[in-house]
Amino acid sequence: MAEFVRAQIFGTTFEITSRYSDLQPVGMGAFGLVCSARDQLTNQNVAVKKIMKPFSTPVLAKRTYRELKLLKHLKHENVISLSDIFISPLEDIVLRWGCSYFVTELLGTDLHRLLTSRPLEKQFIQYFLYQIMRGLKYVHSAGVVHRDLKPSNILVNENCDLKICDFGLARIQDPQMTGYVSTRYYRAPEIMLTWQKYDVEVDIWSAGCIFAEMLEGKPLFPGKDHVNQFSIITELLGTPPDDVINTIASENTLRFVKSLPKRERQSLKHKFKNADAPAIDLLESMLVFDPKKRITATNALAHEYLAPYHDPTDEPVAEEKFDWSFNDADLPVDTWKIMMYSEILDYHNVEAGVAAMEGQEFNGQ
């Protein structure tokens, strides 16, 4: 059994295996605290995320289980990868397990911090957007919608390598998908208008908002609230077409949209005066009201603007779709705990098998 050590970070106890040392806080969110650490086994810096009280409710239990399943399944250069997961011996798996620890790569910074510190030059904007779309092509091919894409969920290292992270809100591709998700500035209009019938296109809209922010140096649609957010969008992109308005299910929302003054779509080249024509063309194809007319990640990669980096032989898709069979399950917390424990055991068994195979190959050389 692994030896565990304790550390106090911001008043929170981290009980981790002795494999990890030099814990330093790097971020805190609604669901957990993230620390950097040194992996003694690989001599690499890693991020250790402690998920607080993941089994306090069935909803949070499913969220934690979903994030682990996704991290195990998604294996791509532009998606954050899982390198370890464990529970502390103080937490009882059946009765009161109150935390779990996910260990992933540590990239040093995120796009939000970069954007608030300095303007980005064209080649960096192109390279970052290329990697975002390359990651989305893979994620979408796995049957997964991120749903909460924003600059703080885009991690970057000193080599400008980029990885999409935080799949806690990710969902199955589902034409009847519902829910109030995503940070408002980057939220697609179909989520605000209908709360239903949305799919992978919501991530393309979010990526378009991030692209615009990289070009402009500030958020494109900084709405103060739900209503103001949509109004700001129409000021730039004009009134939604009738076929989009007709999909609105809520009478109150429909009444609000129809009450707005008729607006014409503004030319993005006047808004983004320093952007070249290919950048404007790609941005316009991403920020389209009708999700079915929005460009796909695959087609965006082939766009002229991303030509310096586009390589169709090195933009892989998922080998198989993600298994969402658990997602509609309405299970008690104890069942989610057992399922989570099973996934952790499976992860370590697979990792041990891979290590053994690599050892055999090495010894056979």
From Swiss-Prot:
UniProt KW keywords: ATP-binding, Cytoplasm, Kinase, Magnesium, Nucleotide-binding, Nucleus, Serine/threonine-protein kinase, Transcription, Transcription regulation, Transferase, Virulence
Catalysed reaction equations from the record: L-seryl-[protein] + ATP = O-phospho-L-seryl-[protein] + ADP + H(+); L-threonyl-[protein] + ATP = O-phospho-L-threonyl-[protein] + ADP + H(+)
UniProt: ATP binding residues: V26, G27, M28, G29, A30, F31, G32, L33, V34, K49
Gene3D superfamilies the UniProt entry points to: Phosphorylase Kinase, domain 1, Transferase(Phosphotransferase) domain 1
Cofactor(s) essential for the protein: Mg(2+)
Keyword Metal-binding: no
GO molecular-function terms, A-Z: ATP binding; MAP kinase activity
GO biological process: stress-activated MAPK cascade
E.C. numbers: 2.7.11.24
Residues the record marks as active site: D148
Null allele phenotype: Leads to reduced growth rate and conidiation but shows increased sensitivities to SDS, Congo red, and hyperosmotic stress. Results in reduced expression of the stress response-related genes ATF1 and SKN7. Moreover, NaCl treatment fails to stimulate the accumulation of sorbitol and glycerol. Reduces the expression of the ustyloxin biosynthesis cluster USTA gene. Finally, reduces toxicity on shoot growth in rice seed germination assays.
EC primary class: transferase
Motif (TXY): 178-180
InterPro entries attached to this UniProt entry: Kinase-like_dom_sf, MAP_kinase, MAP_kinase_CS, MAPK_Sty1/Hog1, Prot_kinase_dom, Protein_kinase_ATP_BS, Ser/Thr_kinase_AS
Any single Gene Ontology cellular-component annotation: nucleus
SMART domains the record matches: S_TKc
Domain Protein kinase: 20-306
Cellular compartment(s): Cytoplasm; Nucleus
Domain notes from UniProt: The TXY motif contains the threonine and tyrosine residues whose phosphorylation activates the MAP kinases.
Family named by the database record: Belongs to the protein kinase superfamily. Ser/Thr protein kinase family. MAP kinase subfamily. HOG1 sub-subfamily.
Role summary: Proline-directed serine/threonine-protein kinase involved in a signal transduction pathway that is activated by changes in the osmolarity of the extracellular environment. Controls osmotic regulation of transcription of target genes. Involved in environmental stress response, hyphal growth, conidiation and possibly secondary metabolism such as ustiloxin biosynthesis or the biosynthesis of other phytotoxic compounds that are inhibitory to rice shoot growth during seed germination. Plays a key role in responses to cell wall and membrane stresses but not oxidative stress.
Protein name: Mitogen-activated protein kinase HOG1
Native source organism of the sequence: Ustilaginoidea virens (Rice false smut fungus)
Gene of this entry: HOG1
